[in-house]
């Protein structure tokens, strides 16, 4: 079975609002097979997990697996306040939870110190807001890239506003012009092609 955590986002494209407003217990939905672009290295001698807000979702699976294996790990979870802490009851069962509540006078989320105090060879995993991941990657400068893992909710790349190009799908006998400001996926979908996709942001790699 799946456990899916979806935070209602007023700036979303509508998916989170639909789930909160319309989906009910007993509804049947179609889902694609799971994909994992944020795999856990279970052979690491120590693991440092860093989550912000709903970024705890993929991290929680890692917590469960590491705890099951009896592996050494630390979890740092940052939220604005206690009301935004997801899965608190389950996470509270782990003695190595470090909770950071920015609006409640809690301990500052010092990524540099967290990284510096980790054992040599530790693997680091971070998922959360863009600002957190950017700060984490900066603080992790100097750590072997194979030990640093992130999962983002949005793509930093911007769609080109100048130029344009032509694509010819391998299984199609025709070409498609991609104008400035458009993505290949949006043009192919508009043309009626059956293109596999998921996030529509160029992150997951499905398309």
Residue ranges, per PLM feature:
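Short, glycine-rich nucleotide/cofactor-binding loops
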Residues: 46-57
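Conserved S-adenosyl-L-methionine
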Residues: 65-73, 144
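A short, well-structured juxtamembrane/interface segment
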Residues: 32-41, 106-114
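Ferredoxin-reductase
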Residues: 1-32, 36, 42-46, 79-81
